[in-house]
Design a protein with these regions (language model features):
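Extracellular recognition modules
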Residues: 102-104, 457-461
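Edge beta-strands of extracellular beta-sandwich domains
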Residues: 110-122, 465-479
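Solvent-exposed loop segments of extracellular immunoglobulin-like
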Residues: 424-435
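Extracellular beta-sheet-rich ligand-binding/adhesion modules
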Residues: 482-548
Length: 548
């Protein structure tokens, strides 16, 4: 006796059993802040791994308890149906706020497991640029002048700095791991200390009631000529009191735009620079042209044509041939030209540039150091205060925020019994597979990588050379129940050569019979599965059966 099961019939598990299972969250990471849009919304991309057959993954965010109340808790939302390969990836729309993230996974009506991640934010992301009153200074830091820490839990940075000297082409930034900003922390990629940004972060979180993240691509002591030269030519070595590494100082800003800003989004670049142009006596037209060039290149390189800049008006300097502290009006006039204060017919006027704080008048004891250049003591808080005044409602209403670019998704297919062939789409370029914590070692530069047990990610570039990192995929030693078992040719159920994975299906596997193929369960044997999808045929002989 025999019978044939028709095409396109799907057998589903009829009896649910309680299975001990685990699920984790590998993306995002704790304290990450994602840029919101002007409607107070952003997409959070969520990914992780699970260890048993799953047909649905859900997620929600829970607003952390704070005074005043903040955030909007969401309901459980399906982020992926029928994930495969022990890996899930989905998206959740979230309002501005500071959250704990939860995920859970199901098999039918059976809840298999949950996982949680504390402190995930949707708020405002800023990229700082300029010279030492933007970055802090390593010598001043060693003297104890580093600015106040952030007291609010919601002020996030990546505590990392690019080693000096590094050419632009040699900058490899690590995967972002966020911390609350402490006084002596670096602010990736090249910020030296908290400076005024911890105090500004506290003020903004209190005022806006959303988390704040800072990145810092400035360089102490740099003039606008060096910024223009390196923005225009990534191999240039500008002379700025010394010969700078190739592509610097702009290279650090560009690296941050391509890496951190691509992944987390951005509201604006905050620019504080002009003191060095005072001592160099740069004229108005030159400074304006330099700054306009840097802004234009930042938009061109990042693919963000309306990237907002907030330009502070700064020029005060003392030192070298300048015996007494002075300001330099040509720099201030040029900054006003770029902003548009002198009208939009000025040749260096640039759209989407906003007026920053006027800082030259901030002088006095416990405001600046003896050189009358660098802020110190209460001066950091005063500087933060004037920045806060300029980041006003008009600025947030009229600036164009850029939300994070989705991280690349991964697909997987078994490559023998113990390897998984993981693949990233070829819409990207320069794939770089890695398996270390910082995601900066290089295992392969192919679009697919055959991997054994372990944790893997891939770095890729988009059409604007932005660098994106996939969420981590965990490849277990035993694939049973995680990877669909697919027929690769007609044959018998209990012959491993019938199956693409080279493994006979078991009661925990999702089995697919491919179109145009027929699989035979031999007499007296049982074909076991968890879920069965028929695109081809199954043939049963006497006393043979299927069982789930």
């Amino acid at each position: 006796m025999k019978y044939i099961l028709s095409l396109n019939i799907t057998f589903l598990c009829l009896i649910s059993t309680i299975i001990s299972a685990q699920i984790n969250i590998t993306y995002p990471t704790s304290r990450a802040v994602f840029q919101r849009n002007n409607s107070n919304q952003s997409s959070i991309y969520i990914a992780g791994n699970y260890t048993t057959f799953t047909d649905k993954v859900e997620a929600r965010v829970i607003a952390r308890t704070m005074t005043p109340t903040q955030g909007t808790t969401t309901n459980w939302t399906v982020i992926q149906l029928n994930p495969s390969n022990g890996y899930y990836y989905g998206t959740l729309n979230v309002s501005g706020g500071w959250y704990d993230l939860e995920v859970r996974h199901w098999n039918g009506t059976t809840l298999l497991g949950t996982a949680s991640l504390q402190r995930i934010g949707v708020g405002e992301v800023f990229l700082i640029a300029g010279q030492s009153n933007a970055t802090g200074d390593s010598d001043l830091k060693n003297q104890g002048n580093f600015g106040p820490r952030a007291n609010d839990d919601r002020v996030s940075v990546v505590n990392y700095t690019v080693n000096f000297p590094t050419n632009y082409g040699g900058v490899v930034l690590p995967r972002a791991e966020f911390s609350r900003l402490d006084s002596t922390f670096n602010i990736a990629p090249f910020g030296v200390s908290a400076w005024c940004w911890g105090a500004l972060g506290d003020t903004l979180t209190k005022r806006l009631n959303v988390p704040i993240a800072f990145f810092n691509g400035g360089w102490s002591g740099t003039g606008s000529n060096a910024w223009r030269e390196s923005a225009n030519d990534s191999t240039a070595t500008p002379f700025n009191f010394f010969t700078m590494p190739r592509g610097m100082p702009y290279g650090n800003l560009r690296a941050a735009l391509h890496f951190y800003v691509a992944q987390f989004g951005v509201r604006a670049v905050l620019w504080h620079q002009g003191e060095t142009d005072n001592v160099q006596e740069v004229n108005r037209d030159t400074y304006g042209n330099n700054l306009k060039m840097v802004i234009t290149k930042s938009r061109e390189h990042s693919g963000k044509s309306n990237l907002a800049w907030v330009v502070s008006k700064a020029s005060r300097f003392k030192g070298f041939q300048i015996i007494n502290s002075r300001t330099w009006q040509p720099v201030i006039d040029a900054q006003n030209d770029v902003i548009g204060i002198n009208g939009n017919t000025q040749p260096n006027y640039t759209t989407q540039v906003f007026e920053g704080p006027i800082t030259d008048g901030l002088v006095g004891p416990n405001i600046r150091t003896s050189d009358s250049i660098h802020f110190v003591g209460n001066g950091h808080r005063i500087l933060a205060g004037v920045w806060n005044q300029r980041l006003n409602t008009t600025f947030f209403t009229n600036s164009t925020p850029y939300l994070p670019i989705p991280p690349p998704t991964l697909t997987g297919d078994c490559n023998g019994v113990s390897n998984l062939l993981i693949t990233v789409s070829n819409i990207y370029s320069s794939p770089n597979w890695n398996n270390n914590f910082t995601a900066d070692n290089n295992l392969s530069t192919s679009y697919s990588y055959s991997a054994s047990s372990g944790n893997y990610r891939v770095k890729v570039k988009d059409s604007n050379q932005n660098i994106l990192i996939s969420p981590q995929i965990n490849i277990p030693t035993n694939f049973s129940g995680l990877i669909p078992i697919i027929s690769q040719n007609s044959g018998t159920w209990h012959d491993f050569t019938t199956w693409k994975c080279g493994r006979i299906p078991t009661s925990i596997d999702f089995v697919i019979i491919s179109s145009g193929q027929e699989v035979i369960v031999s007499s007296g044997l049982t074909g076991r599965f968890k879920r069965l999808e028929l695109k081809g045929n199954i043939r049963l002989f006497n006393a043979s059966k299927l069982q789930n």
